[in-house]
Amino acid sequence: MTIWEAFFLGLIQGVTEFLPISSSGHLELAQYFLGFEKLQSYVLFNLICHLGTLGSILYMFLPQIKQSLITERNHIFHIILGTLPLFPLVLILKPIKATFDQPQYLGLCFLFSAALLFSGVYFRLQMQKKHSLRDCLTIGLFQAVAVLPGISRSGATISAARLLGWDKQDAIQFSFLLAIPAILGGTFLEIWQFLKLPASEIPPIEIGQFLTGFITSFMIGCASLWAVIQMMTQDKWVYFAWYCLFIGIATTLYFQM
């Protein structure tokens, strides 16, 4: 992997992790066309990029995180509750994920993302001030489904919150705070699986490329978070739905040819 390829993949991760268009789906496509999808070194590189975007959340939402830890600890309980469905559902969906990891199925997942985004824009319950424990669990279920590449985690969770009647600000904040344990847990699980590989299959660590991917995904991730907040508050969320619909159709047609 060259420095420029590392920059390009870090850019994709940073742009797509928080925009509701699926970072995993776009990385799958990019690595397919670059010929990287089967190489262990790029599995590890993806993990580094995910840690970069995790850093973006911690940086951009630091005031809210401090507030949750000091004065509004019920928020922490809501995050834990929303994370609970992730573990059993990931185990259930793991065999399905192995199938949907194939590029030819990405289009279907992008189309599912589009349907979620459209539903979050056009179909909502009456606005509610308080958020129930059931709401947190429901949003957590939507997050678990997003383990499939092509289904956006932020798109699924924000759309679920909007469907349940949450206002825009609460939906965005809960979605991205919910991402912290999800990304951490997923990253450590992947690292654990990676370390169990035979020594002969563990690739050399490319420090320059990994640093490039991490820094790029962090910086672009911060910009993407800002863009998501602006797009949501300005009622431009539906643009992402149309984008997922387009790329879903294009991907499906390409791999059926």
UniProtKB/Swiss-Prot annotation:
Its EC number is 3.6.1.27. Keywords: Antibiotic resistance, Cell inner membrane, Cell membrane, Cell shape, Cell wall biogenesis/degradation, Hydrolase, Membrane, Peptidoglycan synthesis, Transmembrane, Transmembrane helix. GO terms for molecular function: undecaprenyl-diphosphatase activity. GO terms for biological process: cell wall organization; peptidoglycan biosynthetic process; regulation of cell shape; response to antibiotic. It is a multi-pass membrane protein. It comes from the Bacteria. It catalyses: di-trans,octa-cis-undecaprenyl diphosphate + H2O = di-trans,octa-cis-undecaprenyl phosphate + phosphate + H(+). Pfam families: BacA. GO terms for cellular component: plasma membrane. InterPro entries: UppP (IPR003824). Its main location: membrane. Catalyzes the dephosphorylation of undecaprenyl diphosphate (UPP). Confers resistance to bacitracin. HAMAP family: Undec_diphosphatase. Bacitracin is thought to be involved in the inhibition of peptidoglycan synthesis by sequestering undecaprenyl diphosphate, thereby reducing the pool of lipid carrier available. Belongs to the UppP family. This is Undecaprenyl-diphosphatase. It comes from Protochlamydia amoebophila (strain UWE25).
